[in-house]
C-alpha cells in the first residue's frame, strides 16, 4: 500500500497538514519535525507506527519526495501463466530477469546479476532500461510495447521483450507477453499466494517458552541529524553512545563506519553473542538510516531490526522503547522515569549549531539519563508481566502478554510461521486497517471497544503444525484463499480487497471465522480455492486467574492512562496490534493467533453494524475494534 493510501486510512487527520507543506500523492518519504526537538522519517514501511506512536505538535521543518531506495514488502506472488507474466514488484527489470531465467539468456542474466543492488535501474522506465541494454550490447532484448508491433503478421523481432501495460482498479501493471498471438489482456488480476509452500513442515517452528535473563550489555544511543546539505537524504551530524562516546566525522559514511568500529570494539571486549542498542523512536530515525547505509560495510548486515556482525555472528538488537510506552517524545519519556527535565533535540539546521551544542552541553548526562530510563522501563515490564527475563525480540505488548500466558499455561504445542511464504500468508489474512468510505469531520462520532477480551476469551486459536487442503473441515480453524464477489448494495463489506478496497470482484485470503461471518451477513459469493488448516484448537485466553490478576488487580491504574500501568492495560484491552502485525520474519511471532483475534473482533463489529441504531448511520471508517460514523 502506498504512503498516501496509508495516510488516508489513518485514524489521525494528518494528511491535510502534510499536503499544506508540500506532500504529493506519489511521495514515499517524509522528513518532518513533530515538536521543537524531534525530527522523524516517515516511509511506507513505518507509517502504521507513526500514526500509533506520534502526536504532531509542531511542524517547523518538512520535506517530502519520492525515493527509489525505499523498498516495500509485497505479500503476493508473481502472476505467471503460459501467455504472460506480471511481477508483484511491478518492476520492468524483474520482467527481464524472469525472461532471462525462463529462456536461458545467459548474457542477459550476467548483466542483471551485476546490477542487483542498483535501485535506480530497478525502478527504470522502458526508455532507461533500453539505454542500459544498449550500453551492455544487449539491445536484441529491448522492451517493446505490444501496441507497437503487428501481431497479425508477426512482424517483430522474436528476441525483443514484448510488454503490455494495463490499468486495473486505477493501477498500472507491467506485463511480459510470452505468447504474442494467444495473449489477451486480463480483465482482473488474481495474485497468487503459494499456500502449498507455506504449509511445508520446515516453514513452521515450535514456539519457545524459554527466556533469557535481562541482557547486561545494554547501551543507549542516539543519532543527531543536520539538515543543511541535501534535500533528499538525512545527514548524520553525530552519534551519541552510552556511556560518554560522541562520534562525528566528515560525512554519513565516515560517521557510521566509526560507529560500527565502536560496536565491534564492544563486541570483542564483552565476548558476548548479543548486545542491545536501545533508544526512543529508533524506528523513525536510527533504524531507517542504518538500513539505508549498512550495505556499504561488508562486515555488517542489517536484518529484522538488528545488526549482525559477520566475523563473530554477534547480534546487535535495536530495541525501540517507544513501542512499549504511551505516545510521547524523548524528553517526556526521560522525565517520566527519572524526573529529570532535559532537552533531547535530535536535529540542527547547521553543522555549526550542532558543534556548538556539543561543546556547551553535557552529552554524557543526556545519554546517562536516557540509559537509566530504559533500564527502569524494561524492569517495570518484567515485574508487571511476571517474567523471568526479557526478550528483545518482543514485538509489542500483546506479544509479551501471549508469551506470559503460554508460560503460565505451560502449553508448548504452538507453531509460528518462519519462512516468508508462511509469514506473508498470515499477514494477508490480518485485516487491521480502516475500510474508509468518507472523510472524518467535526460531526463524526467514534465507537470504540473498551475491551476486546470478552470477545476473544471464548474464541479458539490454532494449535499444532498446519497442513494444506482444498476442502476445509467444518469446525476446524483454517485460512483460505478465496474468489470473492460482493453485492453492490453492501457499503461496508467485511471481505474486501486490500490492494483496492472499492473492488467488487477479487481474490483474497481470509480466516474461516471471517468467511463464516460473511455467509451469515449475506451478500457475498465465495469460492474457496485452497487452504491452510490446523489439526487442533485451544482457548488461549481462558486462564481467568492470571488475566484477573493482571487486569482487575491493577484496575486503579487502568483509570489513569498517564501511568505506564494504566497505558499498558488500556492498550491491551482495546486490542491494538499495530506493532505485532509488523513482527519481523526471522523472529518468533504470534501472527496466526493475531489473525483469529482480529477475526473475532470483526465478527462482533460487523454484526453490531447490522443493529438498527447503527444500520441507519453513515459509516465513515470502520475497522476491527472501532467504528467512526455520522
From Swiss-Prot:
GO molecular function terms noted in the UniProt entry: DNA binding
The keyword Protease belongs to this UniProt entry's keyword annotation: no
Sorted UniProt keywords: Host endosome, Late protein, Membrane, Virion, Virulence
Processing and modification events after translation: Not glycosylated or contains very little carbohydrate.
InterPro entries: Poxvirus_F12L, TF_DNA-bd_sf
Primary location class: virion
Assigned GO CC terms: host cell endosome; membrane; virion membrane
Listed GO biological process terms: regulation of DNA-templated transcription; viral process
Keyword Cell inner membrane recorded: no
Recorded superkingdom: Viruses
Subcellular location: Virion membrane; Host endosome
Family affiliation: Belongs to the poxviridae F12 protein family.
Role description: Late protein that plays a role in intracellular enveloped virus (IEV) transport to the cell surface on microtubules. When absent, viral morphogenesis halts after the formation of IEV particles, and these are not transported to the cell periphery. Important for plaque formation, extracellular envelope virus (EEV) production and virulence.
Protein name: Virion release protein
Amino acid at each position: 500500500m502506498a504512503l498516501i493510501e496509508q495516510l488516508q486510512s489513518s485514524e489521525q487527520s494528518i494528511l491535510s497538514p502534510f499536503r499544506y507543506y508540500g506532500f504529493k500523492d506519489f511521495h514515499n518519504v517524509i522528513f518532518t519535525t513533530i515538536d521543537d526537538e524531534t525530527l522523524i522519517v516517515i516511509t511506507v514501511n513505518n507509517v502504521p507506527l507513526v500514526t500509533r506512536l506520534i502526536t504532531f505538535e509542531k511542524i517547523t521543518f518538512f520535506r517530502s519526495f519520492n525515493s527509489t531506495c525505499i523498498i516495500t514488502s509485497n505479500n503476493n506472488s508473481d502472476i505467471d501463466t503460459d501467455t504472460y507474466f506480471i511481477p508483484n514488484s511491478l518492476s520492468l527489470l524483474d520482467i527481464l530477469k524472469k525472461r532471462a531465467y525462463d529462456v536461458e539468456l545467459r548474457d542477459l542474466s550476467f548483466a542483471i546479476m551485476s546490477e542487483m543492488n542498483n535501485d535506480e535501474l530497478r525502478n527504470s522506465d522502458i526508455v532507461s532500461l533500453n539505454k542500459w541494454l544498449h550500453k551492455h550490447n544487449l539491445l536484441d532484448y529491448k522492451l517493446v510495447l505490444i501496441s507497437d508491433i503487428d501481431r497479425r503478421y508477426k512482424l517483430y523481432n522474436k528476441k525483443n521483450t514484448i510488454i503490455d501495460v494495463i490499468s486495473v482498479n486505477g493501477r498500472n501493471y507491467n506485463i511480459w507477453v510470452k505468447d504474442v498471438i494467444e495473449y489477451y489482456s486480463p480483465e482482473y488480476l488474481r495474485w497468487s499466494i503459494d499456500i502449498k509452500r507455506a504449509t511445508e513442515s520446515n516453514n513452521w517452528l515450535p514456539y519457545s517458552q524459554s527466556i533469557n535473563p535481562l541482557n547486561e550489555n545494554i547501551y543507549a544511543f542516539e543519532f543527531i541529524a543536520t539538515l543543511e546539505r541535501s534535500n533528499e537524504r538525512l545527514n548524520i551530524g553525530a552519534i551519541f553512545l552510552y556511556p560518554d562516546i560522541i562520534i562525528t566525522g566528515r560525512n554519513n559514511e565516515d560517521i557510521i563506519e566509526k560507529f560500527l568500529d565502536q560496536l565491534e570494539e564492544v563486541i570483542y571486549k564483552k565476548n558476548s553473542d548479543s548486545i542491545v542498542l536501545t533508544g526512543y523512536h529508533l524506528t523513525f530515525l536510527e533504524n531507517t538510516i542504518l538500513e539505508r547505509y549498512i550495505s556499504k560495510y561488508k562486515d555488517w548486515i542489517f536484518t529484522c531490526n538488528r545488526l549482525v556482525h559477520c566475523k563473530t555472528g554477534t547480534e546487535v538488537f535495536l530495541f525501540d522503547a517507544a513501542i512499549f510506552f504511551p505516545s510521547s517524545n524523548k524528553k517526556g519519556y526521560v522525565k517520566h522515569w527519572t524526573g529529570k527535565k532535559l532537552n533531547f533535540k535530535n536535529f540542527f539546521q547547521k553543522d555549526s549549531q550542532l558543534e556548538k551544542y556539543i561543546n556547551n552541553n553535557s552529552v554524557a548526562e543526556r545519554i546517562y539519563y536516557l540509559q537509566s530510563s530504559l533500564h527502569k522501563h524494561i524492569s517495570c515490564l518484567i515485574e508487571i508481566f511476571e517474567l523471568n527475563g526479557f526478550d528483545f525480540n518482543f514485538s509489542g505488548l500483546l506479544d509479551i502478554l501471549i508469551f506470559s500466558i503460554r508460560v503460565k499455561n505451560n502449553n508448548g504445542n504452538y507453531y509460528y510461521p518462519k519462512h516468508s511464504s508462511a509469514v506473508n500468508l498470515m499477514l494477508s489474512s490480518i485485516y487491521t486497517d480502516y475500510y474508509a468510505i468518507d472523510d472524518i469531520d467535526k460531526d463524526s462520532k467514534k465507537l470504540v471497544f473498551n475491551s476486546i477480551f470478552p470477545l476473544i476469551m471464548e474464541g479458539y486459536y490454532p494449535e499444532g503444525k498446519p497442513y494444506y487442503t482444498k476442502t476445509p473441515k467444518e469446525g476446524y480453524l483454517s485460512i483460505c484463499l478465496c474468489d470473492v464477489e460482493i453485492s453492490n448494495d453492501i457499503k461496508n463489506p467485511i471481505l474486501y480487497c486490500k490492494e483496492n478496497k472499492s473492488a467488487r470482484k477479487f481474490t483474497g485470503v481470509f480466516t474461516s471465522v471471517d468467511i463464516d461471518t460473511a455467509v451469515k451477513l449475506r451478500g457475498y459469493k465465495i469460492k474457496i480455492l485452497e487452504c491452510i488448516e490446523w489439526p487442533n484448537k485451544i482457548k488461549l485466553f481462558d486462564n481467568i486467574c492470571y488475566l484477573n490478576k493482571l487486569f482487575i488487580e491493577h484496575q486503579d491504574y487502568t483509570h489513569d492512562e498517564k501511568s505506564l500501568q494504566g497505558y499498558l492495560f488500556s492498550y491491551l484491552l482495546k486490542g491494538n496490534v499495530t506493532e505485532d502485525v509488523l513482527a519481523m520474519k526471522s523472529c518468533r511471532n504470534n501472527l496466526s493467533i493475531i489473525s483469529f483475534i482480529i477475526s473475532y473482533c470483526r465478527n462482533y463489529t460487523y454484526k453490531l453494524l447490522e443493529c438498527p441504531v447503527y444500520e441507519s448511520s453513515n459509516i465513515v471508517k470502520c475497522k476491527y475494534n472501532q467504528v467512526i460514523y455520522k
